Amino acid sequence: SIQVAHVISRIGDNTVDALDAVYPAAPDDDDTPRHGPTWSPVEGAPRVPVLVRDRHGSVTHIDAQALVDVAARLDAVITVDVQAGQFATSGQQVARVWGRTQVEEADLKRIRRLIWLGGERQLRQDVGFGLRQLVDIAERALSPGINDPTTAVQVIDEIHRILRELVVRETPSPYVADPDGRVRVVHQPQAIDGLIELGVREIAHYGSDSPRVLARLTEMLTDLRGCALNRYGSTLDGLLGEISKAGSAAAGQEKDRP
């Protein structure tokens, strides 16, 4: 319907707007991953857990730069154990402060406040939320009681638009350094490979008996393969192989029917 098409388009618009702020464009003619400073904990190193207190919800925003300031002041490293879009509840560990045996409650409270929780997911740092909404629409359209491949194809069109933006960009480094180049924060950005899979796998599963859906997914992935950074090639090729197998299996089942 026109209303559903409008919803699909609006989700796509909002998702493309959000990804600009999260995923940097790769340098022109440079498909080599950029390596900055890294960090890993020394075995047995002291650390203090940061637990959610009297709250619950989806992680809507992680202020990595403000966490860098806190970590530098403590002369520590803060690892963030949750990702944008992930649910966290009271008592759950959301971060650790490494290199300290104790941390003042005021600093723990500050760290907790820099990992924002909301009543529902938001697109601010959570591009996966936009894709999740679109995939859910396609899954409902492909359910046996509805069987609306046209709407599913409209969703794939919008996912194509989003993924075409993503496959020419880089997943941000999980390591965030202070001005002196020392890693102070380690977080978990949503990986672009995972977002590609999110936008394809479930639709391919629920649309496995729809030639239109499988054909549109194949068309999309083939186009993405031609423009994507080389680092995403294996993910795209793997998905193309899965869809080819799904189509062959569906054709075989159809042939076996009396």
Label the predicted regions.
Residues 1-79, 83, 92-258:
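Short basic (Lys/Arg) and small-residue
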